[in-house]
């Protein structure tokens, strides 16, 4: 089972509203996209409906 966590506490609220979750991946993000897309070792990606 994979666990999903949102980036920072601020993104946590956006995560639930926009259904966004963080996936564990080894991907480097640019400095500009680092704040919006990446959060440390987690990458923000859109969640698909089940």
UniProtKB/Swiss-Prot annotation:
It is found in: Nucleus; Chromosome. Keywords: Chromosome, Developmental protein, Differentiation, DNA condensation, DNA-binding, Nucleosome core, Nucleus, Spermatogenesis. Its main location: nucleus. Signal peptide: none annotated. Pfam families: Protamine_P1 (PF00260). GO terms for cellular component: nucleosome; nucleus. Disulfide bonds: none annotated. GO terms for biological process: chromosome condensation; sperm DNA condensation. The keyword Repeat does not apply. InterPro entries: Protamine_P1. Protamines substitute for histones in the chromatin of sperm during the haploid phase of spermatogenesis. They compact sperm DNA into a highly condensed, stable and inactive complex. This is Sperm protamine P1. The lineage of its organism: Eukaryota, Metazoa, Chordata, Craniata, Vertebrata.
